[in-house]
């Protein structure tokens, strides 16, 4: 089989979270994910209680979850209409997880295998 299959390599994973507050199940699913697409309905840390009440996350909570899970990239998404410019709040997430970006309609990525 080695002549046909080549050397083993790590697979790829993408984890998508819809409306959700940070939880152990999401963190477990996101372990080592190449891309985590995660709810960021609220921008500010002081909105964490409100986010929890409605089953959502803040920019910082999603970034912290990505960091704990060892994800490689984080796309924040599902912004509240109160957030008119998600990029303005992005530095807060990037201070926790530097590979965080603001997701947008039509955004695309090609995930590449890491060669052995």
Question: Which sequence ranges carry the predicted segments?
Answer:
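Substrate-binding N-lobe of the ribokinase-like
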Residues: 83
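Metal-dependent phosphodiesterase/nuclease catalytic metal-binding core
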Residues: 1-76, 87-92, 113-116
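Short, electropositive alpha-helical surface patch
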Residues: 86-107
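Short strand-turn motif at the edge of the Rossmann-like AdoMet-binding core
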Residues: 79-80
